[in-house]
């Protein structure tokens, strides 16, 4: 109940944040979601890992990969993305909330977008083109995928700034 009302601290105060082998899937999921929403990705990941070990699926793999990128566990993120891309079905969707109006996109597009973000995170200067290519693959599946469009624009802007710096350095 607390979780559905956005009362994440109250939810955690009720059930705690400790990892307990006897916790039900629902308790583990409440802990994972509450910690994620409280911007505690490392702690949330511990609980997501428990859920994933009990029953791995594409949706958990996506969430875990996203948080692993945030916490700089790029190898772990790649493993989760690879698993999810191998097991994703065409009818799977992912909801995004970064705009005023939440929207859905294909889970495959979401995974390709996340793979692009991972590629960029692995080497922020050398991998811009490869990251843009992967995000473009996501946009081929769903041209209205707002987060992918915004991220591509940011990468293209960064690429242009890099080119300007390199041109200025050559002049000197």
Question: Model-derived features: where do they sit?
Answer:
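"A position-specific structural signal for the A-helix of alpha-solenoid helical repeats
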Residues: 30, 63, 107-110, 114, ...
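Structural motif corresponding to the intra-repeat A-B loop/turn of tetratricopeptide repeats
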Residues: 5, 38, 71, 122-125, ...
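Flexible helix-coil transition and linker loops at the boundaries of alpha-helical arrays
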Residues: 16-17, 21, 87-105
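TPR-repeat structural position
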Residues: 8, 41, 74, 125-128
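TPR alpha-solenoid repeat register
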Residues: 27-28, 60-61, 94, 111, ...
